[in-house]
Amino acid sequence: MANNNLNRPLNTNVADSSNSSSTPGTAPPPSSSDPQVLGHQAPSSSASSLTEDCSSSFARDLNSYNNGQSGATGAVSWEAPHEPSEANAVSQIHPRNGEHSLQQKPKPQKVSGSSSLATSERYKTELCRPFEESGICKYGHKCQFAHGYRELRTLSRHPKYKTEPCRTFHSVGFCPYGTRCHFIHNQPEQQPVLSESTLEEPSSFNGSNVLHLGVNGEQQPGLQSDSPSGFLSVNSQALQAPLQLNQQALSSGGVMPSSHPAAANLRMMCCRTSSSTTAHDADKDPDKDADKDPSNNSANDALAFPQEPGDFSPVAFQNPNTATTTPTAFYNNQQQMGLAASAQFQMPLARPLPSATIFGQASVGPALTPGAAMAPGAALAPAAALTPAAALAPGAAMALGAAMATGAAMATGAALTPGAALALGAAMAAGAALAPGAAMAPGAAMATGAALAFGAAMATGTTLTPGAAMALGAAMATGAALAPGAAVAPRAALAPRAAFAPGAAALAPRAALPPGAALTPGAALAPGAALAPRAALPPGATLRPGAALIPRAALAPGAALAPGAALTPGAALAPGATLAPRAALAPGAALAPRITITSRAAITPGVAIAPGVATASTGILAPGAATATVGNTSSTTITAATAAEGAAPHFTFQLPDVESESESESLEFDVVTSTLDSLLVSDDEDEDDFLRRSSSSSSLNESEFDNTNSSRRLPIFSRFSDSEK
């Protein structure tokens, strides 16, 4: 018979199809006298009960399909391997589905320390590491580990094995159980779902000879399964995840593209089931007609699964849970060449691949350098770079082309726009942001420990030019901003604890804010003139809204410029001018070069002070008052408006070094003194009385008259005394 010819190379007895004791399409019970079967080791009763439902359902569907066929078909059977335990095997028939399976009866053994290990469920389920490394094991055949793949066996799996996703793996991307986990890590690990329309008649597998027989004809019983179903199942320690078959493609006869992850695996598991060619193919070399196999012809394009009998049918074959089948193909090639077990290819352990997760295909992200870290929720755009030890906090984002230097950090919610960069040790606090279009130019940096406080921002168009830096501890307060076009020029710096209040403007090249200095809201530093090179605001100094300082101007600690006060370009508070502590300039007031305002002095609006003039402490200049310098003579012109007079007369006080006076001046004073008819006092008394009367209509400083000589006479009083004499 064709079936006998088919199974002759495997030395397996096949019963006639007319035998009523065996169900068509299933393997008959093997003889107990067969030495090959006697060497087969039985699985535990608990493991058999776990897989009974799966095996019975599979055989039930298979029997229902075979009953509809007109002719008898061959059964799939394979030679049982030798095991060092020397156990006796008996045949049992499941009453529910008539399926034959092997139930093994262990032979009594001598009591020894290794007897418990030999009967363990995990006996020979893992490779012996010393044997794999050196080819020698001191335990010999008593070793509980497999010496090569020929002794390797697998445990029967639970019916729900690899049917649900692993929550730990898909939540954190790591599972401590690794490949031993009973849940799904990668998409190809899911169990195959086989329907009646996809179940073809089991037949010989052309690749089974390749997997079980070497070139020297030696059997490879290590690739076996303890499943009671009796069907071919190949496994090893790394081959633990069953293949997920495309049920729609199998049932509808569709074409599976070659890019599908299971396409390469399915190519290795397709077998010819035509009864007219099975005997002829079994006698030939498995690799002789490999080019004629239709599965090879469709490997590069697609795999077709027609529903007609006699073509291709899938076989329960376990594959590695990696996305590629290159390690499996390499392993098959070594089996064909008859390589030693110790030199065989070790299958890699399964790793979580972004493209093979069951929750969807993940996008390919940019690479991180060693030591770089990204917290959950952080985002790194394509072409962005994280150098070693740099870190992105949750919610932080780096746009295209942005870079972070070694040790730089971004807090939660911080963001860097394209081209922006953070230097070593620099940090952006929570909520800090560089607005769209803001940039840190090439070479610009935030020094170690510098920070942008919460809510601080750089507006559109702002730039930090090359060489600009924010010193250690410098900060921009909440809401502070650099307006469009504002810049911190090269070598400009903010000292520790310096701050820009909301609405404060920029610093010119080489300008500096010393520790504790502040720019209050609304203060303006004019472009090109405000806080120019070497200009400084000492600790505690304040610029009010609208106030300005020209180059080399200075404000002493505690000094203030009132709102609206102006320092005129080139003259107001020029180089060398100083405003003492608690001194103030009212709106509209101005200071000329080399003017010094002492403590507690106040200048009212409209008052101007000429160069070289100094005001005393607590001195007051009324609105409209002005000082000027004429040659070497220092004079004071005061214009005062009172409620009693619409206009005040002009008084001129001249020092005694004047040699003569004009006649017109004498006439003027005669008219003024004609009303003083009761003035008949002495010269000293006349002079004192004049000072008392003139002080009520003038705002001259009394200190200017303290040094007057008592013997000094005014011309008008000299004239009166001469006429009386």
Curated annotation (Swiss-Prot):
A Gene Ontology BP annotation from the UniProt entry: nuclear-transcribed mRNA poly(A) tail shortening
GO CC annotation: cytoplasm; membrane
Keywords: Cytoplasm, DNA-binding, Membrane, Metal-binding, Repeat, RNA-binding, Transmembrane, Transmembrane helix, Zinc, Zinc-finger
Parts forming coiled coils: none
Predominant location: cytoplasm
UniProt-annotated stretches for the region Disordered: 1-119, 276-310, 686-709
Additional note from the record: Rodent-specific retrogene derived apparently from its related family member ZFP36L2 mRNA.
Domain notes: Contains long series of C-terminal alanine-rich repeats that serve to maintain the protein in the cytoplasm.
Protein name per the record: mRNA decay activator protein ZFP36L3
Native source species: Mus musculus (Mouse)
